[in-house]
């Protein structure tokens, strides 16, 4: 049969690239589960009353090449001015060896959060290095493995200060008036829901204020002034006030550590260490505190522990602080950090080492000194005598200066009264400084760089003597070895080889949606048109970004059934928080601010109650029935009991149990009947897109995990993106921004993230995914995700019972395998199965969530039938091994499961196990072997002997 030209053009080619099973494989699986077609299977599983009659109109699919060309044309509308705006964002030089071998490498960016440490030792080591950088530069005892951004870290510092404060009756938080405005914005938003009063004043006036539990200072103020706060901090400490200091990571290379000055908490952005500005993100924040406060710290902490053989190994420490365990009592709701960006920053420090970092910092400072000297020589005045990289220059003809800057494609900071701000960075050259002289002084300034350099080299007083660092930094061998590109390349590869990512095997984590992150989707994030824009540049320079964001928002509106989308939240947890704030402010606008009860099903993810608590709500748990569904009788009773105090319900759909609940619309109706709003958690949108939608179901607001459903990679634990979709009545209450108000910013509400559009530079990934898939591809992706999950469930249910099913015994896009009966019968646990899967070359499914003693499997649509069968065969082989234990062939205390995973060194050691080496490391069906580098970790040892910095030099000998 002759094909048409349209068929030969094959605009939907990417759909077949993204979806793992081909048509023949899909039919085989449909036959196996007893369904005639994808539509028939969907019709059986999804409740009829929520099925869309027509798919969302997001356009036809495009090929990878057509989509890239289209997005390139949009990106070209961005204007790449040289930005000296500062305010916590600077241009960088990302070393090409890190760009190519990490940022562009799926071995790094497709990995998951290192909850399974045995398959995560590489990125755990890189994160431990990040913590060591933080400890050395801040002078404190404990560091986290990153937070979402500097402003969020400030809000977390405030919350932590209250937790650890001995002044229990104090309720005021003092913020120095020269912190970055976006930091103050986010702090104020968080303080409102916690009921704190924020005082903003000159730092030296802090002692004039009473009932203050915590203080936020900025070591290098937003307009550039270096502050010596030693005496002030000492006085504050004598009054038992918790002191937090925001610091510049590059300035800390030269400046004294705030911890040495007495600070309790130090934080800042690590963006300057090699991470492009990207119109606001993603960037990792660093966060450090005194040892006595370690159990009150937010975020993940990497600790040094031991494995079963006594070898040094790394793991995430003190996980009992986290939201998935502590729920509303957690230190923070954050479950995504910025691992990929933290690792870029850590490897930037490894590559440059202390000598290289000092050279960079000194060069930036020298050029700033030269610029200052020239301006002073010509009669201009500087607001501050002490500075690192930022000058606040008083100008008589500010409009003229800004006009000349614009003509030279230069951005200066323009929001300072009668002055401009100029922040230099590692990309600044002597030619740039000469251009700045011309902008500020005119072309005939007559200044010479070399002459000025001689003057300032011998007489620089711009950093106070007391503020110069007098201790060594980064003395650990890891920062003093890998400085040639060859060594660095091999070090990074050695780390990558320790980890298991999607480039090696399926990662069947339930509730995580570890789908393909296609190369074509990733390419645009490193385009300079997207990577180099400052988030506070004039709007007319970011027209490409605005077009791309507006188009993506429009698509998401259509896919979710909502009326508006806000892109600011830079993680799913932030999206939850922002959505709940919108509900809170909506109620307040109706004089119903007393509505503060949030209903949450017992099956919910721990982030839900943690977010509700952060939003100032009381959590009331709604029971689930024996089938895992929301108990409608209990829901009605709890809603009626809450009455006029009911704020909302947080519900996940399909449920966290992996089932399309038949009564979801009734749930929405009950909550609306009592004046509440419905927050539908978007974590499981991968089973909704094109089939149903939150808005159609009846919800009022949802966050969308773009790092799940819409293909932003997990990055080993971040970045994420959590934009929120809202119905029209909530649109006026989504986050705004104090610095940037442009079209696309829907409101004047407070911010939840530092940048107006959150992690804007990764939004092209989701844009590309939707553009290449089109409406038909997106629906098919959801359908195949459902098919793959049901295929696994049907083939494994005899060996491992599926805990919850919906109509006709079907599941949604994931299934829960119940290990409890086997554990009771044989003593083999879900943990043993998870670790044994490593020997078979797989990352484990989600363990003990949402039900203890289970494994939750989510295959996604991207995995082929071949890979699904490989996983199924591994699980069936493991079941046969369990039967061997049950039959007494292998003792419970010594068998391949309890000893898993097995490592290479065991093969050449004395072997005393009742099973062979071959059974241990090459079990049935394993051909392409993944080798873990450590055995099972000792979690108890790690938490009892908390050690969160680089291991001693002796470990390298």
From Swiss-Prot:
It is an enzyme of class 1 (oxidoreductase). Its cofactor is pyridoxal 5'-phosphate. SUPFAM superfamilies: PLP-dependent transferases. The modification N6-(pyridoxal phosphate)lysine is found at residue 708. InterPro entries: GcvP, GDC-P_C, GDC-P_N, GDC_P, PyrdxlP-dep_Trfase, PyrdxlP-dep_Trfase_major, PyrdxlP-dep_Trfase_small. It catalyses: N(6)-[(R)-lipoyl]-L-lysyl-[glycine-cleavage complex H protein] + glycine + H(+) = N(6)-[(R)-S(8)-aminomethyldihydrolipoyl]-L-lysyl-[glycine-cleavage complex H protein] + CO2. One of its GO terms (cellular component) is cytosol. This is Glycine dehydrogenase (decarboxylating). It comes from Escherichia coli O6:K15:H31 (strain 536 / UPEC).
């Amino acid at each position: 049969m002759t094909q048409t030209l349209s068929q030969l053009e094959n605009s939907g080619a990417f759909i077949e690239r993204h979806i793992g099973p081909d048509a023949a494989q899909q039919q085989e699986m449909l036959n196996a589960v007893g369904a005639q077609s994808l539509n028939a299977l969907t019709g059986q599983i999804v409740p009829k009353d929520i099925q869309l009659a027509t798919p969302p109109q997001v356009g036809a699919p495009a090929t990878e090449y057509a989509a890239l060309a289209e997005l390139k044309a949009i990106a070209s509308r961005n204007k790449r001015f040289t930005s000296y705006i500062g305010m916590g964002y600077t241009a960088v030089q990302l070393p090409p060896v890190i760009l190519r071998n990490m940022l562009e490498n799926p071995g790094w960016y497709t990995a998951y959060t290192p909850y399974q440490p045995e398959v995560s030792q590489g990125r755990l080591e890189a994160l431990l290095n990040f913590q060591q950088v933080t400890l050395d530069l801040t002078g404190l005892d404990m560091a986290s493995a990153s937070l979402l951004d500097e402003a969020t870290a400030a809000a977390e510092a405030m919350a932590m200060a209250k937790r650890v404060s001995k002044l229990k009756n104090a309720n005021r938080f003092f913020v120095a008036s020269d912190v970055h405005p976006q930091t103050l914005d986010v702090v104020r938003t968080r303080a409102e829901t916690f009921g704190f009063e924020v005082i903003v004043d000159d730092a030296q006036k802090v002692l004039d204020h009473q009932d203050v539990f915590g203080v936020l200072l900025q070591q290098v103020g937003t307009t550039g002034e270096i502050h010596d706060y030693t005496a002030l901090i000492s006085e504050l400490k004598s009054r038992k006030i918790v002191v937090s200091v925001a610091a510049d990571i590059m300035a800390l290379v030269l400046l004294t550590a705030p911890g040495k000055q007495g600070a309790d908490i130090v934080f800042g952005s690590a963006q300057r260490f090699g991470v492009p500005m990207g119109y606001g993100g993603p960037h990792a924040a660093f966060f450090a505190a005194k040892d006595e406060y370690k159990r009150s710290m937010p975020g993940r902490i990497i600790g040094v522990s031991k494995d079963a053989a006594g070898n040094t190994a790394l793991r995430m420490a003190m996980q009992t602080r986290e939201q998935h365990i502590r729920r509303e009592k957690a230190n923070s709701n954050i479950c995504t950090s910025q691992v990929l960006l933290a690792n870029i920053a850590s490897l930037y420090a490894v590559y440059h080492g202390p000598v290289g970092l000092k050279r960079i910092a000194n060069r930036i400072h020298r050029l700033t000194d030269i610029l200052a000297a020239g301006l002073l020589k010509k009669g201009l005045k500087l607001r501050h005598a002490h500075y690192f990289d930022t000058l606040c220059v008083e100008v008589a003809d500010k409009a003229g200066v800004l006009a000349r800057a614009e003509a030279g494609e230069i951005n200066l900071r323009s929001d300072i009264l009668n002055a401009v701000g100029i922040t230099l960075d590692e990309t600044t050259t002597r030619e740039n400084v000469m251009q700045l002289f011309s902008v500020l002084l005119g072309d005939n300034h007559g200044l010479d760089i070399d002459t000025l350099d001689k003057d300032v080299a011998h007489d620089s007083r711009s950093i106070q003597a007391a503020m110069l660092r007098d201790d060594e930094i980064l003395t650990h061998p890891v920062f003093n070895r890998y400085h040639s590109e060859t060594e660095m390349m091999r070090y990074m590869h050695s780390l990558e080889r320790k980890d298991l990512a999607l480039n090696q095997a399926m990662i069947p984590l339930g509730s995580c949606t570890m789908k393909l992150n296609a190369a074509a989707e990733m390419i645009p994030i490193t385009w300079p048109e997207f990577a180099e824009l400052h988030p506070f540049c004039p709007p007319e320079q970011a027209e490409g970004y605005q077009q791309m964001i507006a188009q993506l928002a429009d698509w998401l509106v259509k896919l979710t059934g909502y009326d508006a989308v806000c892109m600011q939240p830079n993680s799913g947890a932030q999206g939850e928080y922002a959505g709940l704030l919108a509900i809170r402010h909506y109620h307040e606008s109706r004089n119903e601010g007393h509505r503060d009860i949030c209903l949450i099903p017992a099956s919910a993810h721990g982030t839900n109650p943690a977010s509700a608590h952060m939003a100032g709500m009381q959590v009331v748990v709604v029971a689930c029935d024996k089938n895992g569904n929301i108990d409608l009788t209990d829901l009605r009773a709890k809603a009626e009991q809450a009455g006029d105090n009911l704020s909302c319900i947080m519900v996940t759909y399909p449920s966290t149990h992996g089932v399309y609940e038949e009564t979801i619309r009734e749930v929405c109706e009950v909550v609306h009947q009592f004046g509440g709003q419905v927050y539908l958690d978007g974590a499981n949108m991968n089973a909704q897109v094109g089939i149903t939608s939150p808005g159609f179901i009846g919800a009022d607001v949802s966050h969308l995990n773009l790092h799940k459903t819409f293909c932003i990679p997990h990055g080993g634990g971040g970045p994420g993106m959590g934009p929120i979709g809202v119905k029209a009545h909530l649109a006026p209450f989504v986050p705004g921004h104090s610095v940037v108000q442009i079209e696309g910013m829907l409101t004047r509400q407070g911010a939840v993230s530092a940048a107006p559009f959150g992690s804007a530079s990764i939004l092209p990934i989701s844009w590309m995914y939707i553009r290449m898939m089109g409406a038909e591809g997106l629906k098919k992706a959801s359908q195949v995700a459902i098919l793959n999950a049901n295929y696994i469930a049907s083939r494994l249910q005899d060996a491992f019972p599926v805990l919850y099913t919906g109509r006709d015994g079907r599941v949604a896009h994931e299934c829960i395998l119940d290990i409890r009966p086997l554990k009771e019968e044989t003593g083999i646990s879900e943990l043993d199965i998870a670790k044994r899967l490593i020997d078979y070359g797989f990352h484990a499914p989600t363990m003990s969530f949402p039900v203890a003693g289970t494994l939750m499997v989510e295959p996604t649509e991207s995995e082929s039938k071949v890979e699904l069968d490989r996983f199924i065969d591994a699980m069936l082989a493991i079941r046969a091994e369990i039967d061997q234990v049950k039959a007494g062939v292998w003792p419970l205390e010594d068998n391949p499961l309890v000893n898993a995973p097995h490592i290479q060194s065991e093969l050449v050691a004395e072997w005393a196990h009742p099973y062979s080496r071959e059974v241990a490391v090459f079990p049935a069906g394993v051909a392409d072997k993944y080798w873990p580098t450590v055995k099972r970790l000792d979690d108890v040892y790690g938490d009892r002997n908390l050690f969160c910095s680089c291991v001693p030099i002796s470990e390298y000998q």
